[in-house]
Amino acid sequence: MGFYALLLIALGMSMDAFAVALAKGAAVRMPPRKIAATALVFGSVEALTPLAGWVGGFYAKPFISEWDHWAAFVLLGGLGLKMMREGLSGKAEDVRESKRESLWMTVLTAFGTSIDSMIVGVGLAFMEVNIAFAAAIIGMATTVMVAVGLAAGGALGGLFGKRAEFAGGLVLIAIGTWTLLSHLGLIG
């Protein structure tokens, strides 16, 4: 598999993370250092999941394909509901000011957006590809896309305040629902 094919795969795998980062950036003000750290967490998780899928290879494929869509739906849906609830709360403070999110929650969110990359890793196990290089490309693309999403979302969040947090929750739920419905064959 060539570099450009891997790059297209990497960009495709980073789109869910980009959408989540856009929503997260709109809801929570982040300084540049926090943006970089969050982007690195997402990129690292996104790079590790295709490696895990590749290692699992053929034997794990039936098991993974049975639950990946449910895991994404539950993780992203739960996080989305939490964001929507916080977006609807009557508190007057600026939700973007100092909201802190634990490393664990960031990793959990990153994992929720990277489950499809694990399946890609399984597929790459059956192709002529350097999996370490492929994982590095996927991780770097995701790191860049998440940083861009957080920064762009931050610019939008100042305009929309709590509505941005509610909308971000809707985005997470939509991504989780789309993942579930597409894996169940109900949408294309």
UniProtKB/Swiss-Prot annotation:
Q: Which InterPro entries match?
A: Mntp/YtaF, Put_MntP
Sorted alphabetically, the keyword list is: Cell inner membrane, Cell membrane, Ion transport, Manganese, Membrane, Transmembrane, Transmembrane helix, Transport
Coiled-coil regions listed in the entry: none
- A Pfam family reported for this protein in Swiss-Prot or TrEMBL: Mntp
Q: Which Gene Ontology molecular-function terms are recorded?
A: manganese ion transmembrane transporter activity
Task: State the protein's purpose.
Answer: Probably functions as a manganese efflux pump.
Q: What is this protein called?
A: Putative manganese efflux pump MntP
Origin species, per record, is Neisseria meningitidis serogroup A / serotype 4A (strain DSM 15465 / Z2491)
